[in-house]
UniProtKB/Swiss-Prot annotation:
Record has Translocase as a keyword: no
Gene name tied to this protein: rplX
GO biological process per UniProt: translation
Pfam families cross-referenced by the UniProt entry: KOW, ribosomal_L24
Family the entry assigns: Belongs to the universal ribosomal protein uL24 family.
GO molecular function, one term: structural constituent of ribosome
NCBIfam families for the chain: rplX_bact
Alphabetical UniProt keywords: Ribonucleoprotein, Ribosomal protein, RNA-binding, rRNA-binding
Protein name: Large ribosomal subunit protein uL24
InterPro entries noted in UniProt: KOW (IPR005824), Rib_uL2_dom2 (IPR014722), Ribosomal_uL24 (IPR003256), Ribosomal_uL24_CS (IPR005825), Ribosomal_uL24_KOW (IPR041988), Translation_prot_SH3-like_sf (IPR008991)
Length: 104
């Protein structure tokens, strides 16, 4: 099955502590989760590793968020939208369900 949300898509968070925020998807994980830039930040206590040159301390990083808690953002309507698939010129393309425009 083709992915409805892909890397570099702009999404809006529907649920959780970051509800209503917009950001780009930086990574799609095979478990059905996404890593979104600046969303779902957690504080990780990092141990120093001098062999790798990693300094210790408390590091803020992005944790995965469930794909069902985000929706793709349609810049034409300014709202969250759903995605459909159709064939154009022999290629499978994604389109927004609200206005039938192609997802860029």
């Amino acid at each position: 099955m083709a992915a409805k949300i892909r890397r570099e898509d702009e999404v809006i968070v529907l649920a959780g502590k970051d509800k209503g925020k917009r950001a780009k998807v930086s990574q799609v994980l095979p478990t059905g989760k996404l890593i979104v830039e600046g969303i779902n930040l957690v504080k990780k206590h990092q141990k120093p590793n001098p062999q790798l040159g990693v300094a210790g301390g408390i590091v803020e990083k992005e944790a995965p968020i469930q794909a069902s808690n985000v929706a793709i953002f349609n810049s034409a309507t300014g709202k969250a939208d759903r995605v459909g698939f159709r064939f154009e010129d022999g290629k499978k393309v994604r389109f927004f369900k609200s206005n039938s425009e192609l997802v860029k």
